[in-house]
């Protein structure tokens, strides 16, 4: 039976989610992720993922905390990654730093992670829990989650009406990794009653926590 989350757990996870939001428009194709390290009720380090290829949220928080990370609890908006990409696995960094507990808002659906991050932490003796404020965490990365789960881009269709000649224009917006930060372009019109077209955008690539 899992241990219920405390009021403090909710507070610090909400903080991690707010940090993750700072990656809006910059993390593509990676997901937006925030991390808060807490020891004895005090925040000792925090961070958020800024751009693909740059340090992940957990690594930034660990660097800020230094030795204070030992025995701390890490609140992460997405399960720590467990695979080697352009950056090393965050799960290994948390273990090496001596973090005692990891709370993830949700598990990472990326096939390269898919529970392996939390499993590796648990096997190393780190207490793990997942599912705190999960719905809010999912809202951060609709494009990334759709790609990982269905192999499809996240697309938003917008309509606007030109009152001058009552023509309707459409704009297709294709979300990338964090989903939702990249967009498409629009078409233009010509003289003498000429027409225009909509534009579109797409996303690709994988992501890490």
Task: Indicate where each model-derived feature is located.
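Short loop/turn microsegments at loop-to-beta-strand junctions
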Residues: 31-33, 44, 156-157
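Small-residue (primarily alanine) positions within well-ordered alpha-helices
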Residues: 16, 20, 57, 61, ...
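N-terminal glycine-rich anion-binding loops that anchor highly charged ligand groups
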Residues: 27-40
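N-terminal nucleotide/polyanion-binding subdomain common to many enzyme families
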Residues: 27, 126-161, 167, 175-176
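Short, compositionally biased leader-like segments
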Residues: 1-15, 128-133
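Short, basic/aromatic recognition patches
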Residues: 10-26
